């Protein structure tokens, strides 16, 4: 299983879509607070449909609580990847492993410098885009990376028809 980490997500439908994605892929979802919405927001529920009960979701009070609660230190910190337009390697250049953490920033501002500055360059990855593009929608970005990582892991746990 892999882990999706949303750092202070702001837009309920994006998070709802990602909940549904995690429920359908078996990925763990981590939400780092504060959230830009309440947990009972109808837009969150509508986007996630009835998948909330099938997704494995953990909420963390802040970034440091996330690191501590998940034991993301030392060697395991090397398996935390930050998706950022400031990254160099493409998301598809990473050799993903079970247990990896894929962290995405808030929709309007991306990951803060105090997170990115403490990560080595090879852990700051990006999704290729055209030169004049600013960013992609959060839920679309998560889906792109999730399916690349899952593909590399042989779609572990998926029902595949031969």
Curated annotation (Swiss-Prot):
Gene Ontology MF annotations: RNA binding; tRNA (5-carboxymethylaminomethyluridine(34)-2'-O)-methyltransferase activity; tRNA (cytidine(34)-2'-O)-methyltransferase activity
SUPFAM superfamilies the record matches: alpha/beta knot
Any one GO BP annotation for this protein: wobble position cytosine ribose methylation
Top-rank EC class of the record's enzyme: transferase
Catalytic activities: cytidine(34) in tRNA + S-adenosyl-L-methionine = 2'-O-methylcytidine(34) in tRNA + S-adenosyl-L-homocysteine + H(+); 5-carboxymethylaminomethyluridine(34) in tRNA(Leu) + S-adenosyl-L-methionine = 5-carboxymethylaminomethyl-2'-O-methyluridine(34) in tRNA(Leu) + S-adenosyl-L-homocysteine + H(+)
Localization, UniProt: Cytoplasm
EC number: 2.1.1.207
InterPro entries associated with the record: Alpha/beta_knot_MTases, SpoU_MeTrfase, TrmL, tRNA_m1G_MTases_N
UniProt KW Methyltransferase keyword: yes
Record-listed S-adenosyl-L-methionine binding positions: 83, 105, 127, 135
CDD domains, sorted: SpoU-like_TrmL
Cellular component terms (Gene Ontology): cytoplasm
Function: Methylates the ribose at the nucleotide 34 wobble position in the two leucyl isoacceptors tRNA(Leu)(CmAA) and tRNA(Leu)(cmnm5UmAA). Catalyzes the methyl transfer from S-adenosyl-L-methionine to the 2'-OH of the wobble nucleotide.
Family affiliation: Belongs to the class IV-like SAM-binding methyltransferase superfamily. RNA methyltransferase TrmH family. TrmL subfamily.
Quaternary structure annotation from Swiss-Prot or TrEMBL: Homodimer.
HAMAP family in alphabetical order: tRNA_methyltr_TrmL (MF_01885)
Protein name according to UniProt: tRNA (cytidine(34)-2'-O)-methyltransferase
Organism of this sequence: Photorhabdus asymbiotica subsp. asymbiotica (strain ATCC 43949 / 3105-77)
């Amino acid at each position: 299983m892999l882990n999706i980490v949303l750092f202070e997500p702001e837009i309920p439908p994006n998070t709802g879509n990602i909940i549904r994605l995690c429920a359908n892929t078996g990925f763990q979802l981590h939400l780092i607070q504060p959230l830009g919405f309440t947990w009972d927001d109808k837009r969150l529920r509508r986007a996630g449909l009835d998948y909330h009960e099938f997704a494995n979701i953990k909420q963390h009070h802040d970034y440091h609580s996330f690191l501590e609660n998940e034991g993301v230190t030392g060697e395991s910190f090397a398996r935390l990847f930050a998706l950022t337009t400031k990254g160099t390697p493409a998301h598809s250049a990473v050799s993903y492993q079970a247990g990896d953490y894929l962290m995405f920033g808030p929709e309007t501002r991306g990951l803060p410098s105090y997170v990115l500055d403490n990560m080595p360059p090879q852990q700051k990855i990006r999704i290729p885009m055209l030169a004049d593009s600013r960013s992609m929608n959060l839920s679309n970005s998560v889906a792109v990376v999730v399916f690349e990582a899952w593909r590399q892991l042989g779609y572990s746990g998926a029902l595949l028809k031969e």
